[in-house]
Design a protein with these regions (language model features):
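Nucleotide-state-sensitive switch-loop elements of NTP-binding domains
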Residues: 3, 7-109, 114-122, 126-139
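Alpha-helical scaffold elements adjacent to nucleotide-binding pockets in ATP/GTP-utilizing enzyme cores
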Residues: 68, 93-97, 152, 168-171, ...
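Short, hydrophobic/glycine-enriched beta-strand segments
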Residues: 1-3, 424
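C-terminal accessory "lid"/substrate-recognition subdomains
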Residues: 29-31, 110, 116-119, 125-248, ...
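Short glycine-rich or small-residue beta-strand-to-loop segments that form or flank ligand, phosphate
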Residues: 81-87, 156-157, 329, 422
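Generic C-terminus detector
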Residues: 401-403, 407-469
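Hydrophobic side chains in well-ordered alpha-helices
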Residues: 8-9, 94, 168, 342, ...
Length: 469
């Protein structure tokens, strides 16, 4: 949500002396340029343009971002640089660009208005249809882009909203239960020239099933850099997809206490998370000002590799079973493969059964391939995520990351290894019983299962078109 993102950035600029926000506006990409602005708490400090790279606005952003952060670092006048990402920019991609540029990230924060959650998850429009495509070849949808922005960040800056209800807060908690949630006040933010801004904010119609109530979110990055040669380096925070400290080559890179893969007892780990609101996330007392809590979160630390592992379908930290305020999460785990034709026939019903579903699944005619399930906004993405570890020779295991081996060990079965179904469905008004019956009907029958893997591979390859074979 643009307003939520701007409120989070404004709060950081107000609470951290000598801080600036770096923002690349991609709305001018059609004219061949990307507009870059740098502002502080008083307004715009400088503005410029970056040319498109290969007709791709995000490519231009990647080319321009690190040099600008380094320029701010070298000037030695900026304590915090907030990288405010544009609406459809993926925080994961930009966080990895900053990390590989020799800069250290201190956090990734997504700013959220809970009242806009469902409208975004229900919006299956292509980004191009709403003017948010980052390139001519951009085929992403509003819903799946938003879901990734939300789920990647270990910290959610939750803007206060009179329209948000218990259902909205429960949905937020169940979609990303491990996130640290920090409350922020809704500010009267402008674009630096006195104009209020609100890009792509859908109205909130009456709720029917899980479809229209709504939400919107934007990630925030912050990176903290150690001072080079005794000079102060700016920390960099990004609103839209994470907090990036881009001032120096030794920025803080630890994982926050609630970040995936983080050890709360490890040196440099962030503070324990403070929960707000009701629902599955529970409530914990808050200490200090709202602003200081957001600043603490912005400097908590961020591990790019751990964050990537937490999103990989083979070892993703998926939500757990939950039922709160009319919102439910079903975790469906089985050790029998799907029949390809029956599953393919059920895809539309399964995709529309929940506001959000994701996980990994096992197809009988592709017994060695781990498949990724990613659905939002009534659209489903299915893709190969590589082999199941059970299909690899022992010698290849040494090349598998430890986190992947650990995830496989949790699912290990004496006969099938890590091959399994692990799908998670989250939605208001979730029909658990009907969903489970539909999923069960797609599994191999006892007779089909007993025929063995050689027979499974001869089943009709219904998913070839989806997997581009």
């Amino acid at each position: 949500h643009a307003d939520a993102r701007q409120a989070a950035v404004a709060r950081l600029l107000a609470d951290v002396p000598d801080s600036v926000a770096l923002h690349h506006d991609l709305t001018t990409a059609a004219a061949g340029t990307v507009v870059r602005t740098i502002r502080d708490a008083t307004g715009i400090v400088s503005a410029g343009e970056a040319p498109l790279v290969n007709d791709c606005a995000c490519c231009a952003l990647r080319e321009d971002l690190v040099p600008e952060l380094r320029r701010l670092a070298d000037a030695g006048l900026t304590r915090l640089a907030v990288v405010e990402l544009w609406d459809s920019v993926e925080p994961k991609a930009m966080a990895e660009v900053v990390a590989t540029g020799g800069l250290r990230l201190t956090s990734v924060i997504t700013a959220v208005d809970p009242a806009l959650l469902l409208p975004y998850l229900a919006d299956g429009d292509d980004l191009a249809e709403v003017g948010l495509a980052a390139a001519a070849t951009d085929r992403r949808t509003v819903a799946d882009t938003f879901a990734r922005q939300l789920e990647y960040a270990p910290v959610l800056a939750v803007v206060s909203s009179e329209q948000a209800d218990d259902e909205d807060r429960a949905l937020l908690a169940q979609l990303h239960p491990t996130a640290r949630r920090v409350p922020i006040d809704a500010l009267d933010v402008t674009d630096g020239e006195g104009r209020g801004t609100d890009w792509f904010a859908p109205a909130r119609p009456p709720a029917t099933g899980w479809t229209p109530p709504g939400w919107e979110a934007d990630p925030v990055h912050t990176t903290n850099a150690a001072p080079p040669h005794g000079c102060g380096s700016p920390d960099v925070a990004t609103s839209g997809a994470g907090a990036i400290d881009g001032a120096g080559t030794t920025a803080d890179a630890g994982a926050g206490a609630d970040a995936p893969g983080a050890d709360p007892a490890a040196p440099g780990a962030g503070p324990r998370s403070e929960r707000i609101g009701s629902g599955a996330g529970g409530t914990e007392p808050r200490s200090g000002r709202t602003g200081s809590a957001l600043v603490d979160a912005a400097f908590a630390g961020f591990d790019v590799e751990a964050a990537a592992a937490a999103q990989h379908p083979a070892c993703a930290l998926l939500p757990a079973e939950a039922d709160e305020a009319g919102v439910g999460t079903l975790v469906w785990h089985r050790r029998r493969p799907f029949h390809p034709e029956r599953l393919y026939a059920a895809l539309e019903d399964l995709t529309c059964a929940a506001a959000r579903s994701r996980g990994r699944f096992w197809l009988a005619d592709r017994p060695d391939t781990l498949l990724h399930w990613d659905a939002a906004g009534g659209a489903l993405c299915v893709e190969s995520a590589g082999p199941w570890l059970a299909s690899l020779p022992d010698a290849a295991w040494d090349m598998v990351p430890p986190v992947r081996r650990a995830a496989a060990a949790l699912d290990w079965h004496p006969e099938h290894g890590d091959c399994c179904q692990h799908l998670v469905f989250t939605s208001p008004g979730l029909d658990r019983e009907g969903l489970e019956l539909l999923l069960e009907s797609c599994l191999l029958t006892d007779a089909e299962y007993a025929a063995g893997p050689a027979a499974w591979k001869r089943l009709p390859p219904a998913f070839d078109s989806l997997l581009e074979v």
